[in-house]
């Protein structure tokens, strides 16, 4: 039988993707998740938001548009989760036009009120966009 010698040094592993520098943006356009029952959709949105920390350091920014801005102004688990994410360094942008439309500008409790140019720029800078 032929004997094969093992190399003196193991081959180098492929370099791991640098997840620290990757930018994941989450674009939320409604205050519920999915279509059908809004009560179920509200629960699903709570579960979605509380699962976001699992993305780790790549979670860079959350953008709230249209009905999604209600999450930044309505008391409840979603608002609490958004506040926690922001305190952990996640940037939250909230559409000012949308807040005005829903008369929520004064009620907003989390995030930075912003404009569409900032939203477009954020989308272009992100390595990955998640849209539930």
Enumerate the language-model features and the residues they cover.
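A glycine-rich helix N-cap at a beta->alpha junction
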Residues: 78-104
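Low-complexity intrinsically disordered segments
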Residues: 114-131
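Short amphipathic alpha-helical segments and helix-helix/interface helices
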Residues: 49, 79-83, 120
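A generic structural motif
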Residues: 1-2
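Short, well-ordered beta-strand core segments
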Residues: 62, 91-92, 128-130
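Conserved mixed alpha/beta catalytic, RNA-binding, or beta-rich assembly cores of soluble enzyme
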Residues: 5-75
């Amino acid at each position: 039988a032929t004997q094969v010698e093992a190399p003196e040094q193991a081959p180098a592993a492929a370099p791991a993707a640098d997840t620290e520098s990757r930018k994941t943006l989450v674009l939320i356009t409604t205050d519920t998740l999915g279509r059908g029952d809004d009560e179920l959709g509200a629960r699903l949105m709570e579960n979605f938001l509380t699962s976001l920390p699992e993305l780790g350091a790549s979670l860079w920014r959350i953008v709230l548009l249209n009905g999604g801005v209600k999450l930044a102004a309505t008391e409840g688990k979603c608002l609490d989760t958004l506040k926690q994410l922001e305190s952990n360094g996640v940037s939250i942008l909230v559409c000012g036009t949308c807040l005005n439309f829903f008369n929520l500008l004064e009620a907003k409790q989390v995030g930075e009120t912003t404009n569409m140019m900032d939203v477009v720029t954020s989308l272009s800078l992100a390595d990955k966009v998640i849209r539930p």
